[in-house]
Amino acid sequence: MKIIKYLPYIILGVVLLYGFKSDTARDQFQKMKTLTQIIRLVSENYVEDVDMNEILEGAIIGLLDKLDPHSNYISSEQSELISQQFDGEFEGIGIEFTILEGYITVISPIPGTPSDRAGLQTGDKIVRINDKSAYKITQKDVLQKLRGPKGSSVDVTISRPGIDEDIAVTLVRDKIPIFSILASFMIDNQTGYIKINQFSRTTVKEITESLSELENLGMQQLLLDLRNNGGGLMDQAISIVDMFISSRDTILFTKGKIPESNEVFRARKNNMDKNYPVVVLINRGSASASEIVSGAFQDLDRGLVVGETSFGKGLVQRQYPLRDGSTARITIARYYTPSGRLIQRPYEDIGEYYANLGENNREANDSTLAKKPVFTTKNGRNVYGGGGITPDIFSELILDFNKSTRNILSHPDRLTFKFAGEIKNEIQEQYDNFDDFARFYDLNGNRKEKFLSWLQAQEIEFEVEELEEYWDYIQNQILSNVAGRIWGKEFLYKKLLEADNQAQDALIHFDEARKLIGL
């Protein structure tokens, strides 16, 4: 095997390049020689044939895993997908999908894409691709079969609820945008809502457009939802904060070993007229760039932070491209908020790093706050360090369901989504607009009985009394999916907010957010 043959020369090159500068360097050289011996022994003597490329890749992954939870190795295949995610586009047909009952099921066609132009609808099942059955297709196969170069075509056969005959469609692939913003709308006549899913290269452009639209609709206060936003590009997060800051305040600073990793990022003292109050909503899934935004809003007293203590990912990674198309993502610095708080939470035991995320001691109550280091905001308020962003107002999402409710909501067949398809046409015929539907339609009485009968027909086990306990939440999930099917994703999220206790908590704290900015 070529790589094994050349390993001794690679090691010699490293030695000649760096030299024996210390006993540590000599020890490292010996360890590298030992590694070469082990690789050769395994390749020549192991009882079964092994894929040495896979083993060597595992060794690389193991090396980086020893550093911290976020330094990692990315294969060439993964690098391409990640690049598409951060670039904000890929080439394909443009659907959001899930796999239900073995088939690709359309959650929604992305507006303006080939699937949208061809008339694909929420609930459509793709049963054949290029005249071959798509039954029991995997997520990986979906990407391989439906993505492809712009201008190439793919034939799909659609099974649509309520229509007996399948529908044959030829889709010509195109560039597909990956939107950072999942939803942007007015909750009421003064409150705007924006949910950011990730920070990609298009995020600033998207949020600029969304803010402009909401301001034109009369927005006087903003709920910025960063829950379960795992982060993304640091520069996009900094630019978003910059939109709301009118002085040359520090937004973020980083510290590392190499000189270029020590940076201070300041606001540009812009003239954008965004003097309305902001409430930022975070949870344990808010990480990295989300914590840059929420931490800066909090430290600069520009917005009130509501929710749960965030993830605590404050390590800056730099991606180093390797010759085979793979990438080494290596931590080069740490993030600090304007007040000096380290965003990164401790990771001495990497094995427990993710397991500890769900512990109750991350709550923002008096007993846990007493154990955290205290920092001071621009206007002298106390904020807390120790990893992650501790919210100003603690609000935990209430999802403590009984067994029957939990089984319905977490079922792999997405039962609330499926039942929404059963009642969509009835509602579409009855209501011309979302507002009337949201105000007058419910699933009580005979409609509830219809749902319970439908569950029985699906052979789903449940206790009626248990579903009764959480019926308001269950019907909200169903009706939100109906709204999404008929009026689009914006209305799915608008309906979901009605039963979202964290969002409802956030809405009652705008007076405090208003006081922060002197209004």
Give, region by region, the residue ranges found by the protein language model:
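Polar, glycine-rich mid-to-C-terminal structural blocks
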Residues: 289, 301, 312-373
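Extended, small/polar residue-biased N-terminal targeting/export presequences
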Residues: 46-107, 153-173, 177-183, 496-507, ...
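Hydrophobic membrane-insertion alpha-helices, especially the h-region
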Residues: 5-21
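Cleft-lining beta-strand/loop regions that shape enzyme active-site pockets
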Residues: 3, 20-31, 35, 39-52, ...
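Amphipathic alpha-helical interaction segments
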Residues: 37, 54-58, 62, 239, ...
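A generic structural motif
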Residues: 157-161, 336, 376
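Hydrophobic beta-strand signal
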Residues: 127-128, 304, 329, 344, ...
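Conserved functional hotspot residues or short segments at active or partner-binding sites
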Residues: 342-343, 347-519
